[in-house]
């Protein structure tokens, strides 16, 4: 039953109960105990607290007595009470000794009581410990030590006693920290051999106790120690237990040992010698274990200052136990290694021990010797067999050293219950050494990181401050490095290690290397990196072992996974270059090829690679160039092992020549990928200087790799074909030349933002771009695929950089960063292109495919630019100039088509076609880029860039590869115009007079380019200069050979003008720079022939432009010049042989004339040029075009004629009409109207052709109120046109008829309709003329008019107008002649001396004669009425008194003769013809007929044949009579012979015939004839005989008439046959008688 210690009341009740039980139990056995118990009960009843209880010494007496009784039951009851009293101070100090004696007595009883004592004693000491010292302390310890000596003791008692004893000893030592001591007594104790100090009772107890324990070995060997010196009876304590107690003291009382000099002294002179003896001389495993455990507790940093020499001896002893030379047992070596293993886990103690021992040459080195001995041990035959090292990293099939067989369940130092050592396993010893090595590496790494953090190292490196680190860690590391390095190397080359153990070694070695880096120990880091590279890359045991893997390995591993180019692979794309060269080389050198290095690699090497990469990740910021060299070259070789040679290398080898891939699991490859990804990610934290170093190393390695081929031209050299050289230095891999280019690219893509770090970032970018560009433009590279791969990597860098910055979420920061990046990126693209452009291009470059490759390079660069613009164009700000230079790069590709055509050696047309197609593709991509800019970013461009936009457009327009691009580019000019329009600000860009003069002066001085490119130009200068530059270049595009492009360019030009002219600079500048070159361009015949549409559009635009912007002739001094050049331009174009062109020009000329009319103050020179264009037109009669869409000369002339009205209007507006102008116009009209061929399917019989009508309309425009001279010219032209249907038609028919095909004969013009209409117009115009003054100069024109009319009248043409009731043309002409004659006669009456008179009178007489002439019966019948009418009109005019006087006798005689000739109704018979031929004059004829002998010559019974036009004849008969009655004497005189002869002939025929016909009736016409003549003669005679007659000089003609008297008399006999005849004859006979 356990005593409850809850409180005094509870304790009181329990004690009372226990005391009563004790009293009851002792009642019969021991009265003393009973009385004592009762007394204690009484005491208990009186006290109320523990303090009161403590004042009663007798209270504890029953318990002491009960224990002394050795009665088990009473002792048990007493122990129960003592247990309770032990928990609280309740026993008087005076009773403590008795109580302890009671405990000692109780230890002799049963086991339960013994255990109870052991349970109570620690509690008792805890409560009353301050009073227990000296003898009491000895008694206290005796309570436990007694139980250790009991024979046949139960293990539980011994174990509990042992534990309790250790607890009490620990508490005795812990008591040293109590400052208050109940006893002031002091004791002397030694602190050295000659010194002592005084200590209190507690410390004295501890001193004696520690001395007793450390004297175990002395007691056992020298016998008992005096009682006074013994605090603990250890005479019979086993050495092992004593060492256990010592271990406990060393473990739990370290503080006291370190603070108390007396204890330290005992430690040096007692404890350590004891341990050394036990460990060196003991053959007992357990004793050695306990000793080692104690030593382990002493080998601490805290003890070094007090046990320096002792520990040196201890450690040396332990190390000696490890060595091969030691004669100690194996388990002792194990114990030493285990101890050092534990020590190695504590970096602090390692560093401390090193600095205290290894750091001094005069001291025993600890860890150096340890590592040395371990190395020697491992290299011993016994151990080296187990390691089974190899020259390459590999693993045996069944590893000898595994986790299972190299470990023990319990460490030897923990085998406390083993008296004999277990069997020794060599693998365990190896494992211990390996672990020590690992721990030391890890400890050094930890210490290095703590003493010199990596961050600080990086900062120091950035500041380029050498650390100058002479710290403890550096010394320790430097001292241990060689040993650790050799151990790690030994383990790494071991083939017997299990994989997991190998990984531990790798990790340890990695930490060793990492520590070197952290501590800036470059040589040691390089050594580690070198070993790493050798371990990883060396996969053959000797240089002769360069054969393929065995059959089992030759098959392609199904588990090997292809890896993306973003991680390890660096295989560039296959070359697009003509492979003929490489294939030829391959065939030629097949026998000379070197055998490729095997590609086998183990998983262990993969592990090492991962460690190397991990090391690069952690130490990258402080790596030097050499460390990076080992890293990258190792990486390069591994890439070859896993993925084989790069594509460029494969081109020179057959696939069967390439070694098979290694057998790796998918996880192996994945782990490599993962590690490399982490490596790339880690570089993002690199500083710019570190990153610069990495890139520099990569570039250097890349250069070295690319030069390997040249180094190995001698087949005896094989540098780069194997990873290690003769000195075991790793060298670049020739199988993977593009590796470093790939790594540069990947590193750059992971560190894009570093390029934004100001000057450092620019240097980084420059480093990369300069090298990349150098490679891209290097034609000396062995394989062009490397160039293509490089450009792909470079563009990937660019795209990644722009993507990373451009996709940033921080808008403000993004804009700023992209502004920095864009210059780097775009400048690099431009520099790349420039490097390509600078290369010469010759026949060889074309033929060997170099140009093909470089075209692919340019294409890739353009695609990159396109992607950048497509994604982030809106962020671009400063690099637009270079962007446009890049866009223009395809146009500077100097490979021309002629380079191929002139090369006869190049037979492969596919080569040419391929290059041309690539050029097309480049241009297409370039245009796509530009289109992207123009669609999305044009409005955001600065004005300083617009020049480049325009230049780019010109290049796109001018290129000949893609017509669609040329078309589309032309329309882009419109967008540039919109751009400029949007930026127009009237307030800032409008030009003052001063600004205008300044701008004009610069442009006149050919400084336009300077204006738009100079940063010093004002905004208004730049703006206006860009407009001029835009328009000028757009016009320059019209010089393109392709008609479609020319048309599009000029159309866009004028559309821009229409839409944006309000924003334009001064028009005089535009004219000077833009329009004038267009107007002064020299046109070839071919151009004029083929570019009609262009010319037409150009003229349309110009004609629209000029009236709007060049109309101020009054204020603009250059306006006249500008118009003059335009008109000269038109005139030059009209010299074209192309009818289409001329037609277009003429149409635009018409429009221009209409526009000029609206302009005021047009100068005379301009008017003159306008006229000259019209009048100087050269009409050529050429037609016969078979193309319906083509224009003919006829069309041109027609359009020209239709344009005359506005010209006339213009001339009239300024009163500039001159005779010269009119004559030239009419000359043109005259030439035009005689055009010898009509258009297809056109007839001009009933209505005039279009041109004929146009000419007539043109003539109609001339007003009758124009000058008289002009009017005469118009009349002349109309008259000339009127006769076209006659002579001109005949000439055309005669000339062209034989030459034309029959189908075209109907195209010959008849001119009938136009002649008629012209004649009609002539009559109308004549009718409008009131007076007709005839100048001498115009007389010939008038005569010509009359002659033309006379010609028409003469021909008696029956041509009529379109209306059926219209009169024939000859009558119309006669009317004109008649009207005109009337007006002329009026003029001549006033100017009788006019030279026109005689000619006109001749013409007039001729016209009258024509009306009386007989042509042919058919025509005469048709014209008789008109002839009679026309004759009558003329006769009336002629017989007017003042008019007839204008005619001379010859003219009148001609007229009278015509009348006489027309007066015959019948044809002459032979007799009459003979008579007339015999007679020279009509008077003679009359005389002869008067004396005619009717008896000899008879008439005829048949009537003679009638003549046509009898009505005219009758009229003429009457006129002959009337003429004799006319008052004009000259007329009568001239008429008399004719009338006399006429009557004589009539009478002769009548007389002759009537004698024959007898009673036959006389024909009516004969009757009429005779009646008319004889009646007229009667009238004449009456007038002559009448005194009152108005006739003057009545005798005129009487003589001639008197010759008729005989015939009159002869008629009388036959006069009765005709009614009235007889009377007339008789009257005449009487009259003649009167005359006589």
Swiss-Prot record:
Composition skew (Low complexity), residue ranges: 564-576
Annotated spans, Required for function in membrane trafficking: 1501-1636
Subcellular location, record wording: Golgi apparatus membrane
GO biological-process terms attached to the record: endocytosis; Golgi to endosome transport; protein targeting to vacuole; retrograde transport, endosome to Golgi; trans-Golgi network membrane organization
Record field: compositional bias (Polar residues): 547-563, 577-589
Function: Required for traffic between late Golgi and early endosomes. Required for endocytosis and maintenance of vacuolar structure.
Protein known as: Protein MON2
Organism: Saccharomyces cerevisiae (strain ATCC 204508 / S288c) (Baker's yeast)
